[in-house]
Amino acid sequence: MSDIQLNTLKPAEGSKHAKRRVGRGIGSGLGKTAGRGHKGQKSRSGGFHKVGFEGGQMPLQRRLPKRGFTPLGQHLYAEVRLSELQLMEAEEIDVQALKAAGVVGQSVRYAKVIKSGELSRKVVLRGITATAGARAAIEAAGGSLA
């Protein structure tokens, strides 16, 4: 085993490079202009564009909209599954009953029943529409749409 001790540790030969000392005379090869060339914006101190600057073209972060939008009627309509009607205790169901049971949100005005799940009991829907498949399932269970 080699003679490695904490006080003799050093990096491998050639693995570390000395820091570039620019502007310290012509003998260094990086004197005078210090690797910046002659004149121009990039040769000046502080001479760099801001982040996102695209040369005067409208930058990406200003071309894109700040945020999307919410359709005004989005929360007025709700879909109700047959399986949700099955769990409700009331026989006559309207939008108010759906709100009271927590099936739809409080801002909902119109509801539509879709054929998803099973319905095995009689329900009467008032002021609620239904898809053709849901209507058939409700009527097959002895219910109706009023």
Swiss-Prot record:
Bias (Gly residues): 24-34
Record region (Disordered): 1-56
GO MF terms held by the record: rRNA binding; structural constituent of ribosome
Alphabetic keyword roster: Ribonucleoprotein, Ribosomal protein, RNA-binding, rRNA-binding
One Gene Ontology term from the biological process aspect of the record: translation
Pfam families: Ribosomal_L27A
One term under GO cellular component: cytosolic large ribosomal subunit
Entries under SUPFAM superfamilies matching the protein: Ribosomal proteins L15p and L18e
Role of this protein: Binds to the 23S rRNA.
Family named by the database record: Belongs to the universal ribosomal protein uL15 family.
Subunit structure: Part of the 50S ribosomal subunit.
Protein's name according to its UniProt entry: Large ribosomal subunit protein uL15
Source organism (scientific name): Bordetella pertussis (strain Tohama I / ATCC BAA-589 / NCTC 13251)
